[in-house]
Amino acid sequence: MLGILTFILVFGIIVVVHEFGHFYFAKKSGILVREFAIGMGPKIFAHIGKDGTAYTIRILPLGGYVRMAGWGDDTTEIKTGTPVSLTLADDGKVKRINLSGKKLDQTALPMQVTQFDFEDKLFIKGLVLEEEKTFAVDHDATVVEADGTEVRIAPLDVQYQNATIWGKLITNFAGPMNNFILGVVVFWVLIFMQGGVRDVDTNQFHIMPQGALAKVGVPEMAQITKIGSHEVSNWESLIQAVETETKDKTAPTLDVTISEKGSDKQVTVTPKDSQGRYLLGVQPGVKSDFLSMFVGGFTTAADSALRILSALKNLIFQPDLNKLGGPVAIFKASSDAAKNGIENILYFLAMISINIGIFNLIPIPALDGGKIVLNILEAIRRKPLKQEIETYVTLAGVVIMVVLMIAVTWNDIMRLFFR
């Protein structure tokens, strides 16, 4: 149960933060956001704000989404013959079109729609008590959809495709950008929880209680200058020295040279065997000044991003489904993190957030990266691609993503449960 809750919480935070990036910059760019949803499926709460956005909470706590006017399949489901109820404003214009049996207005006019245009000419035409009538529709009118969600209509001037090219570009980039920001913030939290940022550039190390070095009397902080015949100048050189000195050995002992007050002291220690790796019981020292901790959030996030990009490069040149993890693998990893405490959960949250940010920047049309490429092409050509071409390109990207997701999920299931 804890694993399920951790998965829902981590995935939910990451997706909502990602979608909020799109939401915020869409509004700044003059694009109408018709709905900002937390969760998926049937809605359990809805409120339409003064900004025209419907804020909803939906029953399945799995992420969320934004509906931008003119973006993707955001359309109003009204067809010829659709029965609706019209609520009129004092000036005679339609201010609400009700497609559901919910939010009924006793003063509303029943109409069977024969024609409408909510984007350009802003009118609705149909039969009212067997008589054909035409009404002007207010620019900020709302539509109550079949499930009771009330959203604003989307005239052309507030649609995605009519925003400036830079407005569209930053709107598409803002989702991944927010994932990177979330990663930095979570790493800050971790660094402050741990009392500082790891200092891997020095040979001054923290000696862990009950570790191999502590058992031979090495103090809590020690400067290790040599292991065997290998010089130690930083954390990486210490790891390499231990690996070299213990390679192909059973129950090895190590001669460790420690500098104390200008003089060297040598101790002989038996490292702890941990699944074939030999541990001295040391950790990097920490920098606890505010500036180091502040910068540490950025550097830790950057190091994580570089590792992910390196793995992605290897995956491109050496394709292997076993190197990919889908929802099942993420659930397994979140369950493992939950068993090991809050710090592991936070680290997992930061890493997955950065991972998703990078993944979304891959130039596949269904992803934010693909949309950014289309924005760049539009900027170069000084005109957008034809709508039909953009639709087909996006559809191809969706097909690729669906096939990849099915393959990865199937591979996850086979790897985790049948091997």
UniProtKB/Swiss-Prot annotation:
Molecular function via GO: metal ion binding; metalloendopeptidase activity
EC number(s) on file: 3.4.24.-
Sites where the protein binds Zn(2+): H18, H22
Cell membrane as UniProt keyword: yes
Compartments, record wording: Cell membrane
Key words of the record: Cell membrane, Hydrolase, Membrane, Metal-binding, Metalloprotease, Protease, Transmembrane, Transmembrane helix, Zinc
Principal location listed in the UniProt entry: membrane
Claim: Hydrolase is one of the keywords in the record: yes
PANTHER family linked to this entry: MEMBRANE METALLOPROTEASE ARASP2, CHLOROPLASTIC-RELATED, REGULATOR OF SIGMA-E PROTEASE RSEP
Protein name: Putative zinc metalloprotease SP_0263
Organism of derivation: Streptococcus pneumoniae serotype 4 (strain ATCC BAA-334 / TIGR4)
